[in-house]
Amino acid sequence: MTWTTPDLCDRFPEVAVAEPLFRHFGGRTTFSGPIATVRCVEDNSRIRELASTPGDGRVLVVDGQGSLRHALFGDQIGAQAVANGWAGVLIHGCVRDVEILAGLPLGVLALAACPRRTERRDLGDVDVPVNFAGVAFVPGHWLYADANGVVVAAAPLSLEVVGMEH
């Protein structure tokens, strides 16, 4: 049996549940992993840098301040993330190239799509706690996402103990 976020909430009441703000854009709707973070506003320089490093099954959480004016993530960075082993991304902002993202074996959650590319000014913070959707996303904590929503735990959940696979 595989996990679902409702099952995780039932079995682990201490998990944080993100407000239901996000849409799935990637080829995977179920994904999980340790969190890495970027805080940026309309500049995806740090996202591009991180996507080109080994993901090791991590989930990149991006606090784009909820901006709907520019896309922070698209097909090129998505392809880099897949090639480097990232499990998924959660973006408090926009994506673009949605037809291509839908074909990638990557979890991609974002607020919306926007065709305008980002500005690149080499700005942003990496591996800092970020807060949005009613949740604190801390580097090293774990994110679990599926079609039901997003939950965050301070440590990996013992899924095998409750008969679930990771």
UniProtKB/Swiss-Prot annotation:
Positions with a binding annotation for substrate: 74-77, 96
BP GO terms, sorted: regulation of RNA metabolic process
Pfam families assigned: RraA-like
GO molecular function, one term: oxaloacetate decarboxylase activity
Taxonomic superkingdom: Bacteria
Enzyme class at the top of the EC tree: lyase
E.C. no: 4.1.3.17, 4.1.1.112
Binding site for a divalent metal cation: 97
Keywords: Lyase, Metal-binding
Gene3D superfamilies per record: Ribonuclease E inhibitor RraA/RraA-like (3.50.30.40)
Cofactors required: a divalent metal cation
Cofactor: binding details: Divalent metal cation.
Reactions mediated catalytically: 4-hydroxy-4-methyl-2-oxoglutarate = 2 pyruvate; oxaloacetate + H(+) = pyruvate + CO2
Family classification: Belongs to the class II aldolase/RraA-like family.
Chain's role: Catalyzes the aldol cleavage of 4-hydroxy-4-methyl-2-oxoglutarate (HMG) into 2 molecules of pyruvate. Also contains a secondary oxaloacetate (OAA) decarboxylase activity due to the common pyruvate enolate transition state formed following C-C bond cleavage in the retro-aldol and decarboxylation reactions.
Description of how the protein assembles with itself and partners: Homotrimer.
Protein name, UniProt field: Putative 4-hydroxy-4-methyl-2-oxoglutarate aldolase
Source organism per UniProt: Xanthomonas campestris pv. campestris (strain B100)
